[in-house]
């Protein structure tokens, strides 16, 4: 019999995972285990006698053991500080990360508590509460230390590597690729020109767009720290700015977010000045993430309309906030949005949220 054909990204049986969870954790009877979505990782909603949880099964090779241990250490640090986050659950023997043998290789699995409540509604009041929660995480991790190594959210991570993934998709549009490269250089020079000692640095969530949280009463509970790492806090703040755009509702959310953040923690002038730069970095990083993961998500949706949308947004943002504009957008900058990745991945990729909630760039 021929050996099994190689696999790059399998879907683990929810029924088998339920049995494994019941045997491995002190959850009592596991009554349901359902796949929530596939994205950067696979997330399963777990219903058990001792409560609701979320199981994250990492893609093979997506994170190293040390990188996962860093995330776990940060979450447990936040838990000790009393910050509302979805916490990792340890097995009776003390292990928090398990490795499951999948056809494509070992896949890490971590069980988390479920964040209570519902998704935020995007109102000014809830954006204000969200800003307070972001500030509380930054404040609580000022003294976070760990021996585990994690990638930094630096310009190599946010620009250099994403651009390397983007280039093959824009070879037929060299003027547009050059425009993005030039804008990335503006970001690099702009960040370098800011007084380094005045930029707040430390632990960052890396994905504070507003959807990785639930609210119950006055409490906002954060989850999904898979993009976390040491970096500029201005980038963390800029992700929210990028997410909601500049229409009237977006501006109201941004103002409320800043008000909430400042009620818990100050924001320096250098950090505010860096936000427009990091909005561009976020837009480029996300497109690089999409381009780098076509083996699992497909590539047909990375079409000209997709790149038109990015160039149009970058051109408008640069003209308004950074001066000048990218020199070329091949063809008409389409107002139509690309179809986006497969529906199963959409909850993990914010750019493909419903049209009313998509970021502009």
Task: Indicate residue ranges for each PLM-predicted region.
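ATP/Mg2+ or Mg2+-diphosphate-binding catalytic cores
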Residues: 3-5, 168-169, 286-361
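ATP-binding pocket architecture of kinase catalytic cores
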Residues: 48-146
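Active-site acidic catalytic loop and adjacent metal/ATP-binding pocket
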Residues: 37-50, 54-55, 88, 188-235, ...
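Active-site activation/catalytic loop segments of kinase-like enzymes and analogous catalytic loops
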Residues: 233-266, 280-298
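A cross-family kinase active-site recognition segment
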Residues: 121-178, 199-201
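Conserved N-terminal boundary motif of the eukaryotic protein kinase catalytic domain
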Residues: 27-32
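Juxta-kinase regulatory segment immediately upstream of eukaryotic protein kinase catalytic domains
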Residues: 1-26
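All-alpha amphipathic helical-bundle segments outside canonical DNA-binding/catalytic cores
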Residues: 267-279
């Amino acid at each position: 019999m021929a050996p099994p054909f190689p696999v790059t990204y399998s879907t683990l049986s929810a029924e088998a995972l339920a049995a494994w969870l019941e045997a491995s954790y002190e959850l009592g009877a596991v009554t349901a285990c359902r796949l929530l979505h596939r994205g950067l990782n696979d997330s399963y909603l777990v219903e058990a006698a001792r409560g609701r949880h979320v199981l994250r099964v990492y893609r093979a090779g997506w994170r190293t053991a040390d990188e996962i241990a860093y995330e776990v250490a940060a979450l447990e640090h936040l838990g000790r500080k009393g910050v509302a986050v979805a916490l990792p659950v340890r097995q009776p023997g003390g292990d928090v990360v398990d490795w499951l043998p999948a056809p494509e290789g070992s896949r890490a699995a971590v069980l988390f508590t479920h964040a209570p409540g519902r998704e935020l509604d995007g109102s000014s009041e809830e954006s204000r509460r969200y800003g307070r929660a972001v500030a509380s995480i930054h404040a609580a991790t000022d003294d976070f230390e760990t021996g585990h190594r994690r990638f930094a959210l630096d310009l190599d991570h946010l620009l250099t590597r994403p651009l390397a993934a983007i280039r093959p998709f824009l070879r037929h549009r060299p003027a547009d690729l050059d425009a993005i490269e030039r804008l990335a250089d503006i970001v690099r020079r702009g960040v370098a020109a800011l007084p380094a000692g005045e930029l707040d640095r430390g632990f960052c969530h890396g994905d504070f767009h507003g959807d990785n949280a639930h609210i119950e009463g006055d409490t906002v509970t954060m989850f999904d720290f898979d993009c976390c790492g040491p970096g500029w806090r201005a980038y963390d703040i800029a992700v929210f700015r990028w997410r909601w755009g500049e229409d009237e509702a977006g501006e109201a959310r941004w103002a409320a977010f800043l008000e909430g953040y400042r009620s818990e923690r100050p924001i320096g002038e250098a950090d505010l000045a860096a936000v427009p730069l990091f909005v561009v970095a976020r837009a480029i990083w996300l497109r690089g993430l999409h381009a780098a993961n076509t083996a699992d998500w497909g590539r047909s949706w990375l079409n000209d309309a997709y790149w038109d949308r990015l160039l149009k947004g970058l051109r408008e943002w640069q003209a308004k906030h950074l001066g000048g504009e990218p020199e070329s957008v091949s063809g008409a900058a389409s107002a139509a949005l690309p179809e986006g990745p497969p529906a199963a991945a959409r909850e993990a990729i914010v750019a493909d949220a419903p049209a009313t909630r998509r970021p502009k760039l």
